[in-house]
Amino acid sequence: MHLSFGTNKPMNIFKGWENHTERISANWKRLVKPDDTVILPGDFSWGLKLEETKKDFEFLENLPGKKILLKGNHDLWWSTSKKLREFLDNNKFNSVDFVFINCAVCEGYAVAGTRGWFFDDKPDPKILRRE
């Protein structure tokens, strides 16, 4: 989604990304019903710190359905599981959950994931150990 409501990193500098949040909202509301589950496979927010993502989560909370987020390579705000859950609870973001060292069960399926990327010519051992 690459949202940036809480930070100054607009996506409209890239061709094809003009009004992307408005288009996301309109298409989401057209397609997703309140009982649906949407899996967001990373790159949710450009915020660098969890606090900078609050407006992005407000945008997401106001869309229908349950949302499950996985960590993307641009989700630098991603913190510990405890801090992420406290953030959701403290802000009453009730329709959002994380897959983080666990899985989420929805509609009879277990959803799990991890950050992935294509290897360059030489894999980076530091990233491999961390991820």
Task: Report each predicted region and the residues it spans.
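Metal-dependent nucleic-acid phosphoesterase active-site entry motif
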Residues: 1-3
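Core catalytic region of metal-dependent phosphoesterases/phosphodiesterases
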Residues: 5-106
